[in-house]
Amino acid sequence: MSEPMKVVIVGGVAAGPKAASKIIRLMPDADVTIVEKGRFLSYAGCGLPYYISGVVKEQKELMATPVGVVRDPVFFQNVKNVHVMNETEALEIDRASKCVRVREVVGSKESRLDYDKLVLATGASPFVPPIPKVDLNNIFSLHGVQDAEGIKAVLAEGKAQDVVIVGGGLIGVEVTEALVQRGCRVTMVEMLPQMLGILDWEIAKLVEQYMESHGVKVLTNTKVESFEGDGKVKAVVTGKVSLPADMVILAIGVRPNVQLAQVAGLEIGPTGAIKVDEHMRTSDPEIYAAGDCVESVDLLTGHPCYVPLGSTANKQGRVAAVNVCGGNECFPGVLGSTVCKVFDYCVARTGLTETAAREAGYEVVTALAPAPDIAHYMPEAKPLLLKLVADKASRRLLGAQAIGPGSGDKRIDVAAMAITAGLTLDQLANADLCYAPPYSPAMDNIITAANVARNKLDGHMVGVAPMEVCRMLEEKRNFVFLDVRSPAEYEEVRLPGSTLIPLGTLRGRLGELPSSKEIITFCKISLRGYEASLILKAAGFKKVRVMDGGVAMWPYEKLFPS
């Protein structure tokens, strides 16, 4: 009788436990050991902001099964038949002898673990910038359970009134909401021109405006130069201003933990993460890697990319496990599909942004399509703004972004599947999606957005981005900015430089418009703007464009006459 396969897994948070569980399901007699440097196992790191806010009441909920059983070493031993060595650090891989040298964090006792197959799930660590006095008390990163406990302890003292978030990415945005809910005054500082660099500028700007409406101060193009304080942080000094701070959260992203692999001579990819093939094998065929320590492949460009997400880590852990057990499963790559809760808004994206698509060499067409997320006459209807990016030549969908209180995740999931399948806008526009008034408009938002892009490609509509219109206004270009909304809407909010002719009166007032000038039409969402452009073209006007997305997608200052 052959000896059980020995599998050592380094890392016990996401990809590691997933791999261990799948290996035991496929090969019940396998000898599986998880080595985890920290105390806690298999916890939901993405849930930490909600633990800080109090939405998640107890720490154990983050590491429990759906029926409330905590996934601790006893659980893994009794339920999974997996041996766990937590609070134990993997020090060195001896590839020739196929063993891992480990040391207990408390007590420093060392031992050696032999393996037939090794899985590296070493994760990532928060990036801590080399800023003067970054080691002051009350300066935190948010990566693990202990970080969250430290933040909660400061909040419990009731003295963290002013909090500065350094970094405007996903972690920064999510923890900002948690801190506002705890009564803090929050300032977000982002070095780049926009927060949420995974979005196009105009979508990120709408997120910024929405956060500011909830009392958050957002400073972009602002670099932190130092921290001030005697023992505890008291201020954050930027190149523009000094900000009072009782607490600071560093949310500048993570870096893959690759030192163990690198010292062992495993290949590191161009992103700085461990290079793996589609089977999650490293450059050593006996060693697999998965999760935040590895790089992936962008499904659209084919280039290596680093997109650390818990969802990806679990999928990769499963693929690695199947192949450890002799299977032939592949992980094809990622689209960077992401969703984020920002107060009452859903912000989501997948695939390439317009900027990334152009940088990748695509000639693109875009669609901005705001609309209610369900039938407009239903009382539960909420606004949702969609942006689609497609390739002009092939008409294939390349990317999608969503923002608003409506169900954006649903539409972005559809977009992710459409991109993965290589669907064109024409195929997406005729997709047989579910419809009932409480759940969707008759023409779903993503179908409408696809049709907007198709209208552009087919010559029925010429669009112009709000950013370009803003530049034209600033440069005092000679054009007519035609608002075709109702007088009541115009009195409620208007855009600078606009002229009002309601759509219902346009046919009778064509003589008021100069045929020699360009006319850019718009309304609340530019559906009426599109109708107006068709009326103008039919009347012989040659220079007519529609502002994409209308007032709803205008990311600049608006006028409120009332």
Task: Kindly give the residue locations of the regions a language model identified.
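Mid-to-C-terminal Rossmann-like scaffold of FAD/NAD(P)H-dependent oxidoreductases
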Residues: S2-K6, G12, C293-G406, P437-P441, ...
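Beta1-alpha1 glycine-rich phosphate/pyrophosphate-binding loop at the start
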Residues: S2-M85, F127, E177-L199, S337, ...
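Hydrophobic/small residue at the entry helix of a nucleotide-binding pocket
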Residues: A14-A15, I171, R528
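A Rossmann-like FAD-binding core segment of flavoenzymes
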Residues: D29-T33, M85-V106, L113, V180-V276, ...
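Glycine-rich dinucleotide-binding loop and its adjacent helix/turn
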Residues: L120-R182, K217, V276-E278, T499-R509
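FAD-site-proximal beta/loop scaffold in flavoenzymes
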Residues: D135-K159, E228-A235, G239-V322, V414, ...
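Rossmann-like dinucleotide-binding cores of NAD(P)H-dependent redox enzymes
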Residues: D162-V163, L170-E228, V307-A313, E329-A356, ...
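Rhodanese-like catalytic fold shared by cysteine-dependent sulfurtransferases
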Residues: D426-F479, P487-I520, K524-S562
